[in-house]
Amino acid sequence: MGGTSLDPALAEIGKKNGLLVWRINKFVLEPVPEVDHGVFYIGDAYIALYQKYDGCWDVHFWLGKNASTDEIGVAAIKTVEIDDSLGGIPTQHREIQNYESPLFLSYFPDGIRYVSGGYESGYRHVDDQFKNWKPHLFHCKGKRNVRCTEVECEVNSLNLGDVFILDLGKDLYVWMPPESGRLERIKGMARAKNIADHERMGIPKVHILDDVEWDNDSTFWSYFGGVSSVRKVSKGKDDDDNYWKRLTEQITLWKVSDASGAAKVSMVSQGENIRKEQLDPKDAFILDAINGGIFVWIGHECTLEERSKALIWGQNYLKQHHLPRWTQVTRVLESAESTQFTQWFRDWVDEKKKNTFTPLLFQVSDESGLLHVEEIANFTQEDLDGDDVMILDALNSIYVWVGANANANEKKEALNTAKLYLEKDKLPRHKKTAIDTIFQGKEPPTFKKFFPSWDDNLFKNEVRSVQNMRRLLFH
């Protein structure tokens, strides 16, 4: 490892596989205990380092929506320090609250929770944390990637389509109205149990308000104006889905010029004309992959200073092209490119790797007539949700997996959804890519091979039902 004055807080990096997380606390890097992984204060900035194996690292630079400019600056400096100490080869990712990448979210299987304020505003001592407790309400939204965001503790914050957690300190209420989804319910219960058992030493009691109790529990409703207030709760809300945005645009490769001190970009090529040979080791390039995010590629002849500027160049590109600040920005280095980057080049062949494309899994739901698509990173068979339709993209084959409990419209439109996905997608693939429809419980070997392991019995029992998970979590 390089660097002679490594921050003591970074002493464990590179020593073992897995996840390390730090927060910026009073401009100092502070390790986050494993028990608090997945909890983010929206007034702070964080750094996460994931080591898949020695020599394969991903560094994520997370920004809360209320993080100060100074904290963001410290996080950026420390990210460069981590990068330098690991030989300058980690892939760097910029993460924005509410718009985190599927890869980042995959590190937290129970979902993530946003807490108001900064770390200093939170109670950290069991002895006094329940004094003068004020109720907190968390809105748990999402399918596989569940985010629990703190909202105003009032009836107008509730809706019938999502799960909410009412945090009363020594009591936690998981409110699961009829229209909420199976996975949201399971993740909501798991998050409440994690708060009770790990964050608060097992002191709080968890109350589950499901199809029977959701509209009549007097204690829960006392914080929202009484049981009669249930009539004021709105129906489920559909968020504007970002997946299909910008899909009419062309993927573009840009060359970065920083000679004048102000980074400028010039177009190199677009669409199917993008080639690996256009990447010059002496320069930096930006690949705008539309929904695939922004990649800043750094040639191996670039200086350390240029390596450290990569994410800044990416942010400047967003401003210059009037793109949302939450657009994913990832830095990749020559000879250490991930398949998430190389997949956009039709002619990219990596002799070191057997595969130049990593299969992608998407969850597709149509609960109220609005199509919602959500990518699942590091997927397993467990991620196949029987309530929905899933799309497995294997580049030259598209599999539409239809869950047994998908609604009638989802089943009817499954093939059309896959055709729309293929039509809008920008990946360089065979023009005659096949689409196969597969039904839950009847998966062929050609489909199963894309999963790390497969258990034919997984779909034959009720192990993944909400009631069974409730028994397992709160027996």
Curated annotation (Swiss-Prot):
GO terms for cellular component: actin cytoskeleton; cytoplasm; striated muscle dense body. GO terms for biological process: actin filament depolymerization; actin filament severing; actin polymerization or depolymerization; barbed-end actin filament capping; positive regulation of synapse pruning. Gelsolin-like repeats lie at residues 27-105, 148-208, 275-341, 375-447. This is Gelsolin-like protein 1. Residues 70-73 are annotated as: Actin-actin interfilament contact point. One of its GO terms (molecular function) is phosphatidylinositol-4,5-bisphosphate binding. Calcium-regulated, actin-modulating protein that binds to the plus (or barbed) ends of actin monomers or filaments, preventing monomer exchange (end-blocking or capping). Binds actin but does not nucleate actin polymerization, albeit slows down elongation by blocking the barbed ends. By promoting actin depolymerization, required for the elimination of presynaptic components downstream of the egl-1, ced-4 and ced-3 apoptotic pathway during larval development. Residues 1-239 are annotated as: Necessary for barbed end capping activity. The keyword Repeat applies. It holds the Pfam family Gelsolin. Belongs to the villin/gelsolin family. Residues 248-348 are annotated as: Inhibitory for phosphatidylinositol 4,5-bisphosphate binding activity. The gene is gsnl-1. InterPro entries: ADF-H/Gelsolin-like_dom_sf, Gelsolin-like_dom, Villin/Gelsolin. Cleavage by caspase ced-3 activates its actin-severing function and is required for the elimination of presynaptic components during development. The record marks D388, V389 as: Cleavage. Residues 1-131 are annotated as: Actin binding, actin severing, Ca-sensitive. The lineage of its organism: Eukaryota, Metazoa, Ecdysozoa, Nematoda, Chromadorea. Residues 240-475 are annotated as: F- and G-actin binding, Ca-independent. Residues 106-147 are annotated as: Required for synapse elimination during development. It is found in: Cytoplasm, Cytoskeleton. Monomer. Binds to actin monomers and filaments. Keywords: Actin capping, Actin-binding, Calcium, Cytoplasm, Cytoskeleton, Repeat. Residues 133-227 are annotated as: Required for phosphatidylinositol 4,5-bisphosphate binding and regulation.
